[in-house]
Amino acid sequence: MLLVIDVGNTNTVFALHDGEQWVNQWRSATDSTKTADDHASWLWRLADMQGVDLSRVQGCVVSSVVPHAQFNFRNLARRYLNVEPLFIGEPGLKTGMAVRVRHPEQVGADRIVSALGAHVAYPGDLIVIDSGTATTFDIVSADGAFEGGIISPGIYLSMRALHDAAAQLPRIAIQKPPQVIGKDTVSAMQSGVFIGYIELIDGLVRRIKAEWGRPMTVIATGGVASLFEGASETIDYYDQDILIRGLLEVWKRNR
């Protein structure tokens, strides 16, 4: 089995692939102070509850946007799985994906892996929207190259900033309001956050398509992407497995 680990700014995803399909996925809050022992204790406990034998793991691939967390995940793989993990972004690691931007070294590992995961699953030119701490729009050409993109604040980050900067505005749940014009503070905030974000997504997608000049397929992924299902006019597919699929592809290309 292969263990893939996606360390994001907010959440960390652990997923197991048995050579044919994904068999388990677990999610925890990202905490760079957690040791390898902490991760192992949590992971083994969940695996035992579901009857999963982690001693069968023969490889590990890690994508991390949190540099301070990498040491502990490397130790997790070495000490508890007895494997040497592959880390996205390490010298010599092959992704097979050209990065056609001015400073390739500045592109986050998660964005490259998501672009790869989308390319192997969907034909043609793509826009990959990843909604997490930040919302990224990544452009993938039909020949499998990362062509650049857009980075904007994530929906939760925007909502938290609104609450933190304005003392009288409450924390709210993100949900679609019944109408655009809010009739109280909460519905007005929900309209601004939810509908405002849908307009951000749809507006930027339309501008990207106009600039690109060729048909593009739009795929949404990330922790809050499902919130937009049925509300966006431009998203074609919702796919939560893009990044772990990309990690699996990296593993295959570096065996």
Curated annotation (Swiss-Prot):
Pathway recorded for this protein: Cofactor biosynthesis; coenzyme A biosynthesis; CoA from (R)-pantothenate: step 1/5
Residues bound to K(+): 130
EC number of the protein: 2.7.1.33
InterPro entries for this protein: ATPase_NBD, Type_III_PanK
Keywords: ATP-binding, Coenzyme A biosynthesis, Cytoplasm, Kinase, Metal-binding, Nucleotide-binding, Potassium, Transferase
Binding locations of ATP: 6-13, 133
Localization annotation: Cytoplasm
Protein name (record): Type III pantothenate kinase
Organism field: Hyphomonas neptunium (strain ATCC 15444)
Lineage per the UniProt record: Bacteria, Pseudomonadati, Pseudomonadota, Alphaproteobacteria, Hyphomonadales
